[in-house]
A protein has these predicted regions:
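Outer-membrane beta-barrel transmembrane strands
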Residues: 1, 16, 82-105, 130, ...
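Internal, well-ordered domain-core segments that constitute the primary functional module
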Residues: 1-70
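Transmembrane beta-barrel strands of outer-membrane/channel proteins
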Residues: 1-3, 38-44, 108-114, 152-162, ...
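Extracellular/periplasm-exposed beta-strand and loop segments of Gram-negative cell-envelope proteins
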Residues: 12-16, 51-58, 65-90, 116-132, ...
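Transmembrane beta-barrel strand/turn architecture of Gram-negative outer membrane proteins
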Residues: 18-42, 132-155, 245-254
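Short loop/turn motifs that connect adjacent beta-strands in outer-membrane beta-barrel proteins
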Residues: 30-37, 100-105, 143-153, 209-219, ...
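Outer-membrane beta-barrel "beta-signal"
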Residues: 31, 344-356
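Elongated scaffolding segments in large macromolecular assemblies
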Residues: 86-158, 170-172
């Protein structure tokens, strides 16, 4: 269960209330070296934005209603008296299988989820509804051989989202006897699946891990990772679309020095290449404010391939404070990225922490 009271006073989205909880009943059955599990869950998320207040005084500030792709209508001062409520109900289930012995441990899960999110305004005015369907496959495998261990992880996630858009009118009725007025919103027209989203993520990770014979502590590793992503956004009536497909291949490795008395020096490196396989944008009206400010400039990012590298050095040691000993660490990280668009980025960071 999670609750929140979010306040953002510098722009008009203040006083957001959040309730988020999930129920997950599950049952498992184990025989010999096998385990079979079945679980279901119900997830409810409600975010409510009451009448907005803000310290923002810019008279030209706009509040946008976004319906998909380049279609975003901005109204100056539109946040005044604005109310919005998002209520999502999601049901799902998961089937899992585990096999475990002295050398091999494997866990495979299949899951399915169906979600429906209602969007409400004042007096239950509703601009639309969003439906999601999610499929997920996860396989985690560990194979031990002497002082080495093979780690093989596979994950595939596919989600499709469909947004229905409503056209409504406000009906006000007055009781002829009491004179009391009541109002409600009547749906005149429904655009079924006016905006659709398809998202596919696939990840493969392999790592060979070396460990100390006596302590079992990891001393070195080498591995590789491959990642693929496909995104398809489609807006209908009028038609606009965005398609992005990209892949990343990465190599990694690390080695631990000076291993003694809870002290060690880890040096880790990573290098890879990100490939933009396709990036296509088709807009019915490329002159809109959102298209000019967001969608069209973003295509430079989506269409870029780049090489990247990362080096990390971490030293850990025991530190005693008031007779309590914890393992502290100091870590320095540097990363570099170079695109085929003649742009690059550099990053350096340092951190200090402890394991508790």
């Amino acid at each position: 269960y999670k609750g929140g009271y979010l306040s953002r006073l510098k722009y008009p989205r203040a006083r957001t209330n959040l309730a988020d909880y999930q129920l997950t009943p599950a049952v498992t059955y184990t025989w010999n070296k096998h385990s079979l599990g079945l679980s279901g869950y119900y997830h409810r998320r409600k975010e409510k934005i009451p009448n907005i207040t803000t310290v923002q005084t810019d008279p030209n500030l706009k509040y946008y209603t976004f319906t998909g792709m380049e279609n975003a209508d901005g109204t100056t001062g539109g946040y005044s008296g604005f109310e919005r409520e998002f209520v999502n109900h999601e049901f799902g289930g998961e089937l899992s299988y585990q096999y475990k012995n002295e050398r091999i441990q494997t866990l495979t899960t299949l899951s399915y989820a169906k979600g429906n999110e209602d969007v409400w305004g004042d007096i239950k005015y509703s601009p639309g509804k969003y439906h999601t369907t999610t499929y997920n496959l996860l396989s985690m495998n560990r194979i031990k051989s002497g002082r080495t261990e093979h780690i093989i992880d596979i994950s595939i996630n596919y989600q499709t989202g469909k947004a229905d858009e409503y056209r409504q009118e406000k009906i006000i009725e007055k009781d002829p006897v009491t004179g009391i007025e009541s109002s409600y919103w009547n749906t005149l027209l429904t655009y079924d699946e006016r905006y659709t989203v398809d998202l596919l993520n696939a990840n493969l990770h392999y790592r060979l891990l070396w460990s100390n014979h006596h302590t079992g502590e990891a001393t070195a590793y080498a591995g590789a990772r491959a990642y693929f992503q496909s995104v398809e956004d489609q807006y209908n009536l009028p038609s606009s679309s965005l398609t992005v497909r990209q892949a990343t291949i990465c190599m990694e490795g690390g080695y631990s020095f000076l291993r003694k008395n809870n002290r060690s020096l880890w040096i880790e490196a990573e290098a890879g290449y990100h490939i933009s396989l396709s990036s296509d944008l088709s807009l019915n009206d490329p002159s809109t404010e959102y298209a000019q400010s967001v969608l069209l400039p973003d295509m430079t990012y989506y269409g870029a391939s780049y090489a990247h590298g990362k080096l990390q050095i971490q030293y850990q040691m025991p530190v005693t404070i008031k007779k309590h000993t914890n393992v502290w660490f100091v870590k320095a990280t540097g990363a570099y990225l170079k695109t085929d668009k003649k742009t690059d980025s550099k990053m350096f960071g340092i951190s200090l922490g402890l394991y508790h």
